[in-house]
Amino acid sequence: MKIQADDGDIYICKYLTQLQREEIDCLFYELVSHDLLSWLGIRSPEIALMEVDPLHLDSKKIFFNKRLLRQKTWVLAVKWLQDTELLTSLTGISKRSLLKKFIDPYLLIKIALFDLWVDNVDRGVNREGLANYNLLIHARLIDKQVKFTWVPIDHAFCFGGVTKLRILNPSFLPEVAHKLPESPYFQKYYKLLNKEDLHQIIDNFLPLSSLSGIEEIVNQAYAQIPVEWEVPKHLPQRLINFLIDEARVQRARYLIKDRLR
């Protein structure tokens, strides 16, 4: 659902639409993932928790989920980012001259590592071989030159998505199958990178000494969510245990290095 908020900006709003109540956890996943990306210095669209009042909705435009017209509903609102294009299977990157136009050419490596770390099952290649990148290419004017950056979006299916709802634990080690490194775009992209710098980026990603900050990030995200969502109180600790597991972090690094040989 797209709405214009009181601040005049456009937001894409996400809310529970299925009968399976546990899927509300995915909105919590999205909030946690956004904060983790910010902590890692990876920009994603701004998000906010927003209470939508039926009085502000046009009933003629609400074709599904009529309950939105009957009661106030808490939603996760993602701010619409201007000057962006959605990366698709038709998008290619095959020349270093194009890669140099990106503000941080190694950012996609960091996003791939992030996806393995948090088990993002919604960015990569599906079992039918179709790519779903959930990445925007954002154009920015810097010193009178147009520069680009990748912006990751849609993180509701991190932490294993709906198939691992409320059973997530550190024994679920990262796997590269169907993830971003297997996508055609990534396969062309990484071959353009300096291998020495590439390995340095991987080795420095998420230093184990920094994992102590994870607990505060997850707990602060949980403190923000509405009580109406009824997200279990034990879920934050489950996510924390999953994220701070050193074996999982090390395996994420290994998988990326192995894929880039």
Feature locations, PLM:
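Phosphate/dinucleotide-binding and metal-coordinating scaffold of catalytic cores
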Residues: 1-261
